[in-house]
């Protein structure tokens, strides 16, 4: 696939210059649809991270640090237009790299462009305020960048998370060092190339591919970093926070989830059904905000089970290029993890299951989407994050029981309520432990304007919307005494 790329994937972007890893080493990038090698990527390490941080600081001390907010906004808007011009190419790259069906990959590319547009327009709209105080004082606050920000981006949604994290950081005038996941980093490199084309000053954005335990660990612990943004597993997120904590650096964590949808007897089932299924199988279930638990009130439980089982039976899994609703998992390692969870469900009833396309390569990382029914709320499959196309149906009797079950895991990223009862909608919006609660929908179309983040082991801090811009800035108070 290397001939289809307009950039060299074996390079890092450091200080506006494309260069190989200091060690000269590379890594193979594997296509999860068939197990073939796509290309080689740079295996950056601590030396490359150090060079990137130095370049980022130099950018802050130079042109980038002096650039007015409206000019930063123009750059991001220009970058968004370049992304739009490359939507189809970016989608094809992401489909090969992540195994994501083309339609889903294209939606991610459009979302990346939208982040650039939104943040480009917001760049000069964030400001401090004047504060009434004692006679003889003028007091005001300033919004300033943290400085050099580190961004560790996962493999499941590279473009979307680069947009919401790196895009927001650049908007506020930070200089970014991006470490993409070694399993899927091509669109990160493509974004960097487009940023250079857009005119982003040297060092404002630096990209160092590499292994998490090498480049990622070096970035988390680097004393020249002033803020870390991490999306990934709970275990790795804890390590990132510990490393950053030694330098007293703030961290935004977006981690795992076990997000429930609560379906009540009065729900509009025709409206709910597509969301119930799609929220669990999108990107083969490899979504932090995936809805892996479907809680259904007894009065409609059998109907929901039957209709979801029918929907699962209509699912076909195949290579990303076939653009089916479900593609492969990211790797055979992830396939082993998901298969292990499926084996733990041997004591459960399978209500519905998808099929593999006839031509699906044996070397691909495929699993059949699986719906389990009548699952106890304390079962492993109802409590642990699986990160695959697996959903569990859990019956409940009362609203109180539904809330108790929904809040019974360590996570709190997303929840959804399906009910026509307005009072119930408002009660549950408050009672559910989640960073986002959706009423009669799931995800709200993924709008870039909507703050996103979790509670509990789903992490802390907020990305997307204006909240992300506040998070990528720090407040300074100025009090002038003039008598």
Tell me what each language-model feature is.
Residues 1-41, 74-78, 126-152, 252, ...:
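Terminal low-complexity tails and localization/encapsulation signals of metabolic enzymes
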